[in-house]
């Protein structure tokens, strides 16, 4: 039995990138030798145009879960592969690293070793290695078992010849060395590496059946924990309110899912084979291809509805309109129309009498209540769903009772308002009042009462429950009567405080004409801004806003306690400096006179005494000895 391989199907970008990734990971896995200065990368990969020949010589055993056969493979094509890396060209560095690894056994420099300057430096050279003209002819044995995987063994050495070319082909010694090394590595690949890789991959993809017991134990443990949690939640829901029912419902669903998964694992031949078997994968592949093409053959899956057959499935699906059509024959015409949601069309409630719509609403409420009771976890502890109830004919009684309570409340407030005592008696707003109303209680003296009545005879105080914001009023002259009475009242008022008395004394001193002060006292106008004269008589000079005005020179020149005169301070400083300078000169003169009297004979004579000034002659006694030399 022989086969033909479609070799052109391998010329795809996805396959080439996938093979490059696999080869790079395989070549760089493990410990790299010290002669390589970098990782190995694939520069070029081409499968060629000629395909290998594959022939089955013998089939020794063939069963549902096992296979054993002998095959022959031969290839002589134009496949080529180019690798790129960097090689270490410094032999001392290679020898140093190898000696550390072999003799010392430590890669790091923990052991005391000599450190050379340039001999241990790296010197990397790029290397391109091309493998081409591969010829393979070998006989192999394939053994497949569902429990042990796939095993491949070659009886002979399949590699006949291979051509190795690199950047070091000019050096014949290196070219021969590379040829021998690569041939030996490829022979080891066919002898040991390739069978082990194929066996490991087969175990990876066929280990589902071997791990069935582990899956069963894990799912059983999850089912036991979920069942215990559901039992605890069910016991808590019996004592708790209806708000905890959704959580118990979800936990019961989880436990149901775990139990169904356990049932699926128990039936290995039926359900579990559909999930993990190759037949299920083939069905999925057919389904995928049928959707890509216009194929009419669509495979069927258990408990799965195709999108193309969804209308047939939803036509008989139990929804609200279908359940209403069972009792009302008039609604059957609406059941044939597809609906994307579980709702009743609005056309049913249009152009219908009130009795029919009322009956439909009752049917809908009964269906919803029945579904609620049906899917509840425990029928004994179910709570009836709350419905909105509208009661007619009770709004009038409530409105009457509200109006009666409001009237009673207003009567009580009116009674309380009549019992309130006013805080103060404020006069009515008039143009002759002052600028700001005083809301404080006035002293209850007979004199103040008389004056207030005299000033505003026409106004009457009325009790007010609320304090209003004062309104500004214009300044006007007041018509005054009985000056004797007012003078007595004003003198009594101003004599109460000593501060006012001192204020008047300052006012008397500051005024230029005493007749004006007498006029103010006689008219009892007071010391205010509005009192300008005697019987609307305007004085010759206008009074200032402040009653105290400094007109004397002493008051103008008067300084504060914190005032500082800097001119006087500077004068005192100059006097002090002059005095200190005089004392210093006197001391120097006395010292010079004493030194002249004692050491007159030992004093050295100055050479240039005639060129010195008078001041230098005065200080000649100071230079008795030359100064010491200056050292840096």
From Swiss-Prot:
Bias class Basic and acidic residues marks the residues at 401-412
User: PANTHER family in the record, alphabetically?
Assistant: MITOCHONDRIAL DISTRIBUTION AND MORPHOLOGY PROTEIN 34
Listed under GO cellular component are: ERMES complex
Query: Quick one: which gene encodes this?
Result: MDM34
> Which example biological process does GO assign this protein?
mitochondrial genome maintenance
Q: Does the keyword DNA damage apply?
A: no
Give the Gene Ontology MF terms in alphabetical order: lipid binding
Start-end of Basic residues biased regions: 384-400
What function is annotated for this protein? Component of the ERMES/MDM complex, which serves as a molecular tether to connect the endoplasmic reticulum (ER) and mitochondria. Components of this complex are involved in the control of mitochondrial shape and protein biogenesis, and function in nonvesicular lipid trafficking between the ER and mitochondria. MDM34 is required for the interaction of the ER-resident membrane protein MMM1 and the outer mitochondrial membrane-resident beta-barrel protein MDM10.
Q: What is this protein called?
A: Mitochondrial distribution and morphology protein 34
Domain observations: Lacks alpha-helical transmembrane segments, suggesting that it resides in the membrane via beta-sheet conformations similar to those predicted for other outer membrane proteins and porin. The SMP-LTD domain is a barrel-like domain that can bind various types of glycerophospholipids in its interior and mediate their transfer between two adjacent bilayers.
| Low complexity bias (residue ranges) | 224-252, 422-435
Q: Which domain of life is it from?
A: Eukaryota
Against InterPro entries, the record matches this protein to:
Mdm34, SMP_LBD
